[in-house]
Amino acid sequence: MRRWHWAAVGLAALASLLAVLALFIDLPGAGSPAGGRQARAAIAGQLAALGDENTSFSVQNTGIDPARFVVDYYDADGTRLTEDTIPDVPAGASVAFHQDNQEGLPQGFSGSAVVTSDQSVRTVILKQIDKGNGVLSAGGDDGVTRGFSKIYLPLIYSRYGPDEGWNTRLILQNISSGATACVRMTYRNEEGQVALVEPGAGGQLQPQCPQGGLLVAAGSVLEQDHAEMAGSLPANFQGSLVVELVTGEEESVVDTQILAATVDVYHSQRASFATYRGLGWSPSEGVGDLSTGVYLPLVHKNAGEGGGWNTRFFVSPVDPAEPAELTLFYCCDSRLPGGGGSLERKTTVTTWGIVDPAQDAGLPDGFEGSLRIVSDEAVAVVATWSWVLGGVDTFAAYTGVPQAEASTAVWVPLLYRDFGYKGPTGEARGWNSWLRVQVTDGGTASVRITYHGSDLPGGSASFSEDVTGAKFFVQTEDPLLPAGFEGAAVIVSDKPVAVLAGVSSDAYQGDTDAMFTAFGPDVQATPPGSLLTISLAQGWTHTCYVGIQQSVDVALADALGEVLAVYRLRADQGYDRWFAGRPELSTLTTLNPNDALLILASAGATWVQELPGTPPTFATLVPGWNSTCYGGLTKAVELATAEIDGQFSVLYSLGANQSWRRYVPDRPELSTIMVIDQNSALLILKSTPGNVAWAFQP
C-alpha cells in the first residue's frame, strides 16, 4: 500500500535520476511508520547483524507537471530484480515505497534502487532496525540526485570507544547503468595521517580496472562493515574516508560522475544508530556538496534537562594537502558577547578535524543555537547529536547544508503528527516530526510554512511567522495538523534559510530519532554547451526558447514532426504565428533568444536546446499582457517578482495538464504558484502605465 503526500511544487521540469541507497528487507515488525499495514515476513542476514532491518523511501514530485516514477531494484551485484511503476503522480505529490511491502523483492534483500522520473524529484530514506522486545533503531538521510567522481565521508569508526562499540558501515553505489567503476579508498585517522589505502600497492590488477582500483560493476553496490576490518584498521579508529574513481585519460567527465554513498553509524552493544549521505565532489567541474559556506541549524552544548544533549561536527577539506581556515559563527543566545547574541571562533583543519562545542568555554552550558561555517577551502561537514551522560541511546547525524542549498524556497518531503503504531498499550502518540529553520545571515526572516496532506481540508494548511536566528516548529504542537497526519511541507522565506527535519516515535524503546536536511532548488553548473530539455505536452505548452537566433524550422528541429503551431505575443497585444507546412499563413519566421512561446503539439515531444553561457539579466514589460521568460534563479514567487512589485496584477503559468496556475500579489488565498523556476515562461498582466525593466537578481 502507498499513501500520497501532497507537497508544494516549483522546480523546473526536467528528467531526473535519483539513486536511492542501502535498501533492506528483513522482518516487517512494528518498527516501520507503516507498521500495521499488511507485509510479508522475510528473515535473512544483513550487512551487519544489527537486528531485523527494513528501509522505506518517499519520492516527491517537485516538478510542475504530473510525473511518472519508475523504480528499478538491484541486488548487490547490480542485477535488476524487479520494477515498480507509478504513473500520473500529481505535481507536488509524493509516494512512499516500503520495501517490506514490495512483493517482487526476495527474502533477505540487500541492495539498491534507482528512481527515474520525467520531473524533478526529491527523496528521504528511512531505515528501521527492530532489535526485539520493543527496541527500535532508526536513521534517515537524503537521497541523491546525481553521482560524483569523488565522495567524502567525514565520520568513520572501527571498534571505537572504551568498549570498542562504535562502528560504521559503508554502502557505495555505482549509479551508472553501463559504466564500470574502479575506486580507490583512502582512510585517514584523527591525526590526519593515511591509515589505509584500498586496494594496496602491489596487488594484482583486475582486468576491468587496468589503472587499478576496486571493481564496482554498473548498478551494483560495494558494502563494507568497519567492525570487521581488524586486520586493516587499528582498534579505536576514528577518522575519515575518501572514495574516488580511478580513471583513464580517455574517459569523459560524464562517464565518471557515477558514485554515491551512505554511511551507517552504530553501536554494537546499544540501540544507538544514525545514517548520513556521502558528500560528493566533481573536481573537473569544481561543484558538489562541499562548500566554503556551511550551515548547521541545530547545535547543543550540555542542553536540555540534565544537560546531556550535545552536538559535534566532523570536517574534511576538499584537498588534504591544503589546510582549511574556518571561521565559526555561533548564534543566537543573549549570553554570547557578539551582536545579536553571537560568538565568533577561528580554527584550522588540516586533513581532518573535529569541532566539539562542549569543549568551548566561551559557549555557556544549555546553549541551543545554530552555526555558520565560513572556510577558505571547500569542506565536507557531518554533525552528530546525542545524549552524552549515559542511559539514553538516542543518536542522530546530519550533513551540513552547503551555501548553495540554502534558499528562499525549501521542500520537506516527509512530516508526521501522531502517526502509525501507538505501542503495545495503544497509549503512545506514535511518529512525530519537527523542523528547525535557520536564517543564514543570523537575522530575522518572515517565513511561511505550508503543510500538504490528504488529511487536510483542501489538501493544505499554512501559517506565517518571523524567525530570528533559528527556531523549532514542532508538528506535535501544531493545531493545523490532525492526529494521524502524514504529509509534507514547503517553506518560503524572504531570506535564504537552511532547514533540518527530524522524525521520532515514542512507541518504542531504543533510538527512534532520525534527521535529514530539507531541499532547496536544483543547483547545477550550466557552462556553455549545457542543454535544456523541454517536454512539450500534447496540446498547448507555454515555454521559453533560450538558443541563438535562427529560423523556426531549425530551432524546432527536434520536435518539428509534432509541432502544429507556434505563437509569440507582441507588445501591441497581437500575435506573431507559425503554422507547420503553411508558410503563406505564417508571420513568425525567426526565433530570438528568450522568446516566450505558446506551442501547439499533436503529441508529446522532447525539445532540446543549448543554454547560453550568460543568462538574460532583465526582461522589459509593457502595459497589458506580457509573455515573458524568467531568467533569474529559482525563487519564491514574492522574491522573484520583488523588482516589479506593484507593477502587475496577476501572473500565470501553464501546466502540462492544460490548466493555468496563478499568483495574485497579496492574495495567498487566490494564488497557486509559490515558486518560479529559471527559464519559466510566464503570462503577466502589467497594470501600470509605461514600460518597466524586470531585473533578474541572483
Question: What are these regions, as identified by a protein language model?
Answer:
Residues 1-12:
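N-terminal Sec-pathway targeting helices
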Residues 11-20:
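Hydrophobic membrane-insertion alpha-helices, especially the h-region
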Residues 21-634, 640-698:
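Gly/Pro-rich, tryptophan- and cysteine-flecked surface segments typical
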